[in-house]
């Protein structure tokens, strides 16, 4: 009888251990792996809490905090990204089927991303192939980029100014001026030479987030986004 009772206790302890620690750890690890893949980075810290802890295994998260360094979303390179949430439910059926982190409900979910000068320089170099020696400066007034390019077979110096803006959920660099100085043709102002530079389409924002605020400050652009509270 004692052996049976002992065996029963061991089974209960194993089930409790599985429910309280092992399954939640597996769920957290799986979500972290997806974040790493989605944001093209391996520098991720994921913290998720629920009471009881076993709720994490079915996607019910009381508190969530994800911190990412050197992330990529769309054509945006982010120096830092923080995602915070409360009462978040992840659709685990969808996650298990196609590894998509789909949020079906959230009481609160917000994102804060930081784009530094080096990150914007990379965007300009990739989006405008004709630019060399690109340097970017960010101030509260906006973005100033200097570079060299070829114009009519001769090297020219350019100065581009603009701002990171949002329109109907799409994030892009809106050019405000483009000045080109060339020894052969003198000084030209060609505002429409390159046009606006798209960074992120609205549908590429993760977890139903919508951009709510963009702030330019010395050395960086802050992007803030939120998911509207679900009823």
Residue map of PLM features:
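N-terminal beta-strand/beta-hairpin edge segment
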Residues: 41-119, 126-134, 138-151
